[in-house]
Amino acid sequence: MRGIDKFKERFAGHDGEYVLIGGACDLLFGEAGQDFRATKDLDLVLLVEALTPEFGQVFWDFVREGGYENRQKSSGKPQFYRFSRPEDPAFPAMLELFARTDVSLRDAESGLMPIHIDDEVSSLSAILLDEDYYRLLVENRASAGGVAVLSVEGLIPFKAKAWLDLSARRAGGQAVDEKSVKKHRNDVCRLATLLAGGERPAMSEGVRADMRRFLEAYESDPVDLCFVKITFQ
């Protein structure tokens, strides 16, 4: 994954202040000796309640060192930042940050510009504002490749929820990319192959209800396992 080594090096010691979501599958499957869909961006959820001033300094140093040309920020909540087109190819092609509340990641020289929120970002933002899912994220952190990521047990309900949300938007007439919708359902199936069988992560009743809705929908339209390249050992 492009830039992951540079990210791991610079953010060492700050793994209690963020959780990697976008890019987590790549790392988790890599540790299992399997390939995953190529990921060009790193999506981070900032744990605002644990953030330190040092993290903000490390982050802006990272942005400056990478020479990110595009620096953008959304309005409203949750806060969303996007940094892309780094001058240094050793850095991630894109960094996306989510924070449920205001964070002190301000820099007078950053030149942040407004950003258009697409369906993927809007869906994840809505999920992160849900207290049940945020608690699920905080309680299901893991380490993969030396980076703090959302665990397999946490990613499955997150992706199931994203599929439900995007499917509902598409059914309601919104112009949602069908590939984005199917991607999350296929990812749930692939992630399930990494489960050892005895995991029972704590879930709120709301998250359990969403998982039941996902499974009911899946039973009526199952995934072609060959298409998602699931292998059995």
Task: State the predicted function of each range.
Residues 1-233:
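Compositionally biased terminal segments of proteins
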